[in-house]
Amino acid sequence: MNSRIIKTSCTAIALLVGVGILWLAYTTFQSRYLRPFDNQATLFDGSQLRLPAELAGPGPIRVVHFWDPACPCNVGNQQHLADLVSHFAGDGVSFHVLQKPGSRGQLPANLSALKPLASLPGSEHLPASPAVAIWDRQGHLAYFGPYSEGAVCNASNSFIEPILKALIDNRQVTASNTLAVGCYCPWAG
């Protein structure tokens, strides 16, 4: 009789400990990775962005990824960015990255092809990240804004593929001011 009570008690305690561990894991995940979707519109104004002197002027199509390592919104666009690099790097497109000043972090290995920039004139006025700026072959800003609109970023809802395809086909694109709703983190401060 005593051993039966001990077995039942041990099973109940193990079950409670297991439920407690699952609850702790769930709440930790939720507080760290899940957050309410902020449907506030963000205006991306590229009027003050300039390429650094060493990249300015005629050359390849240049894509600059604005990256804040602490922003949880990066998770959604990093695989998409890696796909862009693998698809368009051979088509005369160079990929660069500007890390948020004062932040610390390292890009994932699949984004090691992005060339780091120390600074980019006008980037101190960025409203949010992740964001992207694309300059055409003549060195004119063709696009500035988010990768996509909405809570998730992927090729099916991306603004970037059509713009890069148009620029590769030598069609003019002018979209340096964009209003979008999505997962973004403040860049300034």
Where are these regions (language model features)?
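Short active-site neighborhood of thiol/selenol oxidoreductases, capturing the structured segment around
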Residues: 54-75, 81, 164
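Conserved helix-turn-beta segment immediately C-terminal to the redox Cys motif
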Residues: 49-50, 61, 78-99
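Short, polar loop motifs at secondary-structure junctions
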Residues: 99-105
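Short, internal strand/loop/helix patches
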Residues: 107-146
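Intrinsically disordered, low-complexity terminal tails/loops enriched in metal-binding residues
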Residues: 37-55, 83-88, 185
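N-terminal targeting signals for export/organelle localization
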Residues: 1-47
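Thiol-/selenol-based redox modules, centered on thioredoxin-like
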Residues: 147-189
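Sec-exported extracytoplasmic/periplasmic mature domains
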Residues: 86-90, 140, 165-172
